[in-house]
């Protein structure tokens, strides 16, 4: 996983003594927790932070550049608090990581190919959108890719079937289902039949109209 750089300020440098004051100035209050260091309160520019999250996601490996390079820390986002209605960023918790030690985190599932069973009317179900992995921070994949092109109706993919990238371990105690291709429901079949009947009816009406017009000539 690529290391993403994020400029941050200590709260003294940001000029906001309280989280509320920081938010008024366009900052997101944040704090970094480390194994051997005291928690470090920080302030992150709201706009810059949103752009980074949109580009790299919440599982990104970050290099926090503090006070224009006075210090730096390698971290991952541990928790992000947002307002439930406005989605305004309220607070961020970062966890400092050691690049030489393995960590456990979650990465999204990505599908590749066109599902054979879906072409035949089946319903592709993504049951697990994230998988837990353990690896060195620098080896965290952006996603776990699963090829679905050979899956037929009734087939499924379990976590034990998935080949993880080199250096990455899939953490699981139970061989749970990640993807399944279900048979179409009765309602789905009836809807498709109704749509086909409506389409055929429209074609017949069009043909009848053309015949009548031809007869008038």
Swiss-Prot record:
The keyword Membrane does not apply. Pfam families: Ribosomal_L25p, Ribosomal_TL5_C. It comes from the Bacteria. Keywords: Ribonucleoprotein, Ribosomal protein, RNA-binding, rRNA-binding. Residues 185-217 are annotated as: Disordered. GO terms for biological process: translation. The keyword rRNA processing does not apply. GO terms for molecular function: 5S rRNA binding; structural constituent of ribosome. GO terms for cellular component: cytosolic large ribosomal subunit. Part of the 50S ribosomal subunit; part of the 5S rRNA/L5/L18/L25 subcomplex. Contacts the 5S rRNA. Binds to the 5S rRNA independently of L5 and L18. This is one of the proteins that binds to the 5S RNA in the ribosome where it forms part of the central protuberance. This is Large ribosomal subunit protein bL25. It comes from Desulfosudis oleivorans (strain DSM 6200 / JCM 39069 / Hxd3). The gene is rplY.
